[in-house]
Amino acid sequence: MSCHPQTPQSPSQFSPNTSDLMMSMTGSVTSTTTTLPTPAHSVNGSSIPSELTQDTAMGDDSPHKRKRDGDDMGSRAQKKVHVEDRKLGIDDLHMDVGEKYLLCRTPHPRPRPHVSEDLFEMYGLTGLAIEVARVRPNGEKNALRKTYKGHIKRLGVQGHFDEDKQDPNREYSLSHLMKLPQDVWDLQHVRGQDIRDGFTNEVQQKLSRAMTMGRGVVPRDQWDSSVLGEMGPGKGERQALSARPTAPNTPLPSAGPQGLPRPKTGTPLMQDASRSMRTIKKRSYGDSSFEGYGESYDDGADTGYSTGEGDMSSGQKRRKKVLIND
């Protein structure tokens, strides 16, 4: 028995939908055996329909339950997507899933010029494009031309613009090389020319002779030894002596047996033979540098003759007349 009063004025809290729900729940509980622990009232079926109805009514009036309109049937397809864990396919590639995480954060500037833009208008080539177009802007067909020589001459383009017609199947052309059999190609262009083979025996025998430097067949009158830095024995000494003029009656320095000058006093005996030696005393302006200037012949003395060397006039100097007073 229910403790709640059942008066005629009080409408019944049972509804057809609620009674059917309770009957289905009671039948399913009593007919189904489960291994999970269940409360005692659910096993013996001692649940009271009025209590179930009260719980259902209290659940409907719960403030935490979401409210929606009566005509809002909801989206079953959307609920199904969220409830079922299905795999995404190619159709879901463009599905909006919100902001991507760590994807495309680096900005990529648009390249210039872009292919979608009008390049003729951008670079001022619209007039030239209209002149060489096959169809004019008004729809008329432009006169066909074989070449663009007239436009090239008018623009003043440098170079030779006439094509040079050649036989495409000529020897060593691209088509000729492509048509060569494999064995012929290996024989002509591969065998004996591989870099891994190195030098042949014949080349190695001639290599030492080819790398040796010599005079060769240059004529003697055109050969210049100074280019190679070669100086024969005594040549450099003679050139140095002939290049410097000497004072009158100045003795020449004596040379050794090999053409080298005699070492001076106070200099080391062992010197480099390939190094040229100074043959003339270095000019100086000390007290000893004027030695010998006053020891020359006096023009006023009665010498009788003169060699004439160092004199600006040519020929021998005349003897001076000596007056004898009686």
Curated annotation (Swiss-Prot):
<comment type="subunit">
    <text>Component of the Mediator complex.</text>
</comment>
<keyword id="KW-0539">Nucleus</keyword>
<feature type="region of interest" description="Disordered">
    <location>
        <begin position="1"/>
        <end position="84"/>
    </location>
</feature>
<comment type="function">
    <text>Component of the Mediator complex, a coactivator involved in the regulated transcription of nearly all RNA polymerase II-dependent genes. Mediator functions as a bridge to convey information from gene-specific regulatory proteins to the basal RNA polymerase II transcription machinery. Mediator is recruited to promoters by direct interactions with regulatory proteins and serves as a scaffold for the assembly of a functional preinitiation complex with RNA polymerase II and the general transcription factors.</text>
</comment>
<feature type="compositionally biased region" description="Polar residues">
    <location>
        <begin position="41"/>
        <end position="56"/>
    </location>
</feature>
<feature type="compositionally biased region" description="Low complexity">
    <location>
        <begin position="1"/>
        <end position="35"/>
    </location>
</feature>
<dbReference type="GO" id="GO:0003712">
    <property type="term" value="F:transcription coregulator activity"/>
</dbReference>
<dbReference type="GO" id="GO:0006357">
    <property type="term" value="P:regulation of transcription by RNA polymerase II"/>
</dbReference>
<dbReference type="InterPro" id="IPR013942">
    <property type="entry name" value="Mediator_Med19_fun"/>
</dbReference>
<dbReference type="Pfam" id="PF08633">
    <property type="entry name" value="Rox3"/>
</dbReference>
<dbReference type="GO" id="GO:0016592">
    <property type="term" value="C:mediator complex"/>
</dbReference>
<keyword id="KW-0010">Activator</keyword>
<comment type="similarity">
    <text>Belongs to the Mediator complex subunit 19 family.</text>
</comment>
<feature type="compositionally biased region" description="Basic residues">
    <location>
        <begin position="316"/>
        <end position="326"/>
    </location>
</feature>
<keyword id="KW-0804">Transcription</keyword>
<feature type="region of interest" description="Disordered">
    <location>
        <begin position="217"/>
        <end position="326"/>
    </location>
</feature>
<protein>
    <recommendedName>
        <fullName>Mediator of RNA polymerase II transcription subunit 19</fullName>
    </recommendedName>
</protein>
<keyword id="KW-0805">Transcription regulation</keyword>
